[in-house]
Amino acid sequence: MHNLRDFQPAKKPGTRSRFLQIVAEPDRTKRRKSRAKSKSQPKLTRVAFRVSRLMEFCTLRELQNQTGHSYEEWPLVVLKELMDNALDACEEAEVAPVISIAVGRSSIAIQDNAAGIDTGTIESILDYTIRVSSREAYVSPTRGAQGNALKTILAMGYVLDRERDDGNNNAEAVGVTIIETRGTKHAIEFAVDHIDNQPKITHTTTPSPITVGTKITVKWPAKAAVWGEGLLEWAEQGLKKLVESYAWFNPHLTLRGVWHGKQFIKVVATDPNWEKWRPRNPTSSHWYNKTQLQRYMAAHVARDRDRKRQRTVREFIAEFRGLSGTVVQRKVLDEVGCSHQSLAEFFGVEKVNRAGIAKLLASMRRHSKPVDPKHLGVIGADHLKQRFLAAGGNAETFKYDQRKGVTNEGIPYIIESAFGLHQSALTNDGVNSVPRKLITGANWSVGIVNPFRAFGRTGEGLEATLSKVRADSRAVICAVHLASAYVQYADRGKSSIILTNDAEQPDD
């Protein structure tokens, strides 16, 4: 409230009052008390804390984002990634893969017969500030190029050990992974430094009897559970199905699987000499667009800079299929005008030479032939029929189909499918028949879930197609595989493939 004295008539010098001016003055006593009180109250001075991005691997939510799968599916993620790595390693070593899988009550172990992993590569996997992959930036028919799969696997044990059913976190959580290769056992413990708030990794080595190939054992926390059931037991059927599915799409694979000491699968390769596009085969310039070639070139420039070397444009060109000869290299260099130029200089220092990269790509394509789809690798009717019969299929109902082509973007592909009825569907009117078996995958890897959920412009997927022919619930066996120089996924978990209209399902 204001006193009447606060309202004073306004006057001009030498004149009488003409209007009333209201001057509101706050109570001086209250104002002084307010200032005194403000000074006596404690104040918070905010500071900027540093939070490591590496913690993205150390929480349940973030690791689910990294893998693209919920924690209930992590046993399947571990198996898929380690199987893909083992198969790729065997093909790089140019040996027919012999892989064994053993699932215990608290561990998943996979062993291959490839060339093994050198210590430097293992140490780079433990560096969470970088992403290391021999398939990163390449465009080629490969099982995967995530680049951080092993990093996520190392962290899974810790995250599952950290999260408790009672809602509390285990401060002493640790994830344990063992890599045995080239006579050395690498024991890796993944934990967290709670002061620096970043991963703390302990790496110790001891002798190992494993001298051929690599054996990776992922320890699983005993308390990791789903609805009161151990996580590995929860995933048992999915794990066994995933293991079996790899045998469908890899004719050169000899495979053995053991569950709690009991063998559940043993498959001998139908064709140990089976040929497909291998990781060591040169990629084709026809598979890259301008953005992808720029990324691939940048990766080379960055690696050369780290290794303090200079690669020429000619050396870069020589890596591509059909461009290894000096005559064709000279034609490309002359057309682009980059003879005797280093790749780093051609790429650009202050600004990316996009026009030059586009011109180089056009010239490389002009002087090399596109890859025929058949060179990607055909699984074939004989192998798929053998797997079909082993799964209990009826030989007379077996059908095989193969479609191949090249997309509008120049990407070759082959789609193979095998279909037929299980024996149980032909007896007793299908009563007590087994459930439908659906095996799907791309580039000789297997999908954790069906990745063919949308075909071309129709938007309908494999499930809808099976429903149309009334095969959605009957005891049918259906396998679909896509081989392509470039597979585009709709999600990080690689659970849904984006198919262009070039690769629609057939009308018949």
Language-model segments: which ranges?
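Conserved short strand/loop->alpha-helix "switch" segment adjacent to the catalytic nucleotide/phosphoryl-transfer site
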Residues: 54-79, 138
